[in-house]
Amino acid sequence: MSVNLLLGLQWGDEGKGKIVDVLTQSYDIIARFQGGPNAGHTLEFEGVKHVLHTIPSGIFHPKAINLIGNGVVIDPVIFKKELENLTPYNIDFTSKLLISKKAHLILPTHRLLDAASEASKGKAKIGSTLKGIGPTYMDKTGRNGMRVGDIFTKTWKKRYNTLVKKHLRMLEYHDSCLLYTSDAADDSPSV
């Protein structure tokens, strides 16, 4: 069995999804191994354009199994909308789409942290999509994020609430930094 890999080495939209869609029509498995719901990849199926943010590009291929690996961060709201947008095509997601239980979940507070972090950088901001992807990866590497498999445990609510409380403390810190920098700017002498 051979394995082929299409790996993008740029930031942002470089056309990976479109290329994967063209190249993978005869492949059995199409996998996403990292990333999150940024700009998305645009595909055309039955004359209709679709923008997929999380679901792999091979979802329209009749025999392909699509994998979302543990390196992917998933926003449940965006993911649900993607699934709903594809329901008219009668895709059997239970057999065509597999998701790692170790993939991390983007929470609403991750989005807030992303926005607060970006705002605190002022002119040095990086141009984040504000989707909460960076803060989710911070929780992943810090080993305290929520994973897909966590929602099937009895303690998921406690785990969720603990993480949200941590995020709220971080947001308070960002707010105080913004107040400090804006106060300092107000007090600086004009030239």
Regions found by a protein language model. Give the residues of each.
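Residue-level marker of positions within ordered structural domains that often coincide
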Residues: 84, 186-187
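Conserved small/polar residues in nucleotide/adenosyl-binding loops
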Residues: 180-185
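N-terminal phosphate-binding or glycine-rich loops at protein starts, especially the Walker A/P-loop
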Residues: 4-35
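Glycine-rich nucleotide/cofactor/substrate-binding loop typically near the N-terminus or early
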Residues: 34-178
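N-terminal low-complexity segments that are often proline-rich with Ser/Thr-Pro
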Residues: 189-191
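Short hydrophobic/aromatic residue motifs in ordered secondary structure
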Residues: 15-16, 137, 186
